[in-house]
Every structure is written in structure tokens, then in C-alpha cells.
Amino acid sequence: MLLGLSPVRISFAGGGTDMPEYYEKHGGIVITSTINHFTYVIVNKRKDDKFQIFSPDFETHSIAEKINNLSLKKGTELPVSIIKFLNYKKGMNLILSSDVPPRSGLGSSSSLAVNLINVISYLKGSKITKSEIADSSHHVARNILNWPLG
């Protein structure tokens, strides 16, 4: 079993000025800090190709008999997109949890994205820098899922 955790953050000032739609025209500055609340990723590798995801906090449960047959279903968009982006091909049981509710404004989606990229890269045996983790999580959220994240 592998456990990953990543902190969420709170914005003190400048929230929204980190969005390209704003800062490309006006510049931007954000004052944030992480807090002692986290997202959690728990992975159990499987000997078969089955993929199962469960998250009471992100309100999802999904099973695919083969990891190659993953499809985007409501609540699985982020983990499935990251697994496909990283080209991970082995079966797993994936449990996602968070100390804060989705859409709380504390960056739980971004925290979860960073967490998933870090854990799945580790499973693949890939060495990835913090900067690459940040860039990859931003790419998946903004360019693949078209989510408005800063």
C-alpha cells in the first residue's frame, strides 16, 4: 500500500488574479499558505488489470475491468485523466479522501492533482521534480479537463 498526502491552501489576498484570463491583461499577485488539512491518495497495486476508485469525499465509486478501458465518469475525471496522461497501465485500487469538502475554495482539486501525479509517478518508478509535478497537474486541469484553476 502506498499513501500520499498533499496540503490544501488558503488565499489571504488576490484570489483569482492567478488565472491567465486576468493576469495576462492586468498582472496578478496572490498571497496564500498551505494549512494543516490534506488530500489523501491510497493505492493498492493489483495483480490483474482491474481499476477501482472509491472516494466518499469526492462522491465517486467506479470500476473498470481493465485499466486500459478507463472512461471519464462524473467524479473520476481528475484521477482518470492523470492516469491516462502518465500512461499508467497496471491495475490498482485507488482511494481518495480529503479533510475539506470539494468546492470549498481551499484548492482541494489542485492538491489532489499534485498528490495523484506524485504517487502515480512513484509507482511507475519515474523521478519527477516538484516543478514537473506542478506543471503536469496544471496541464491536466487546465488543458485536458479545461477546469478554471490558477
Language model regions located:
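Active-site signature of alpha/beta-hydrolase-fold catalytic machinery across serine-
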Residues: N115
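Short, conserved phosphate/pyrophosphate- and ester-handling motifs at nucleotide-, phospho-/glycolipid
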Residues: S109
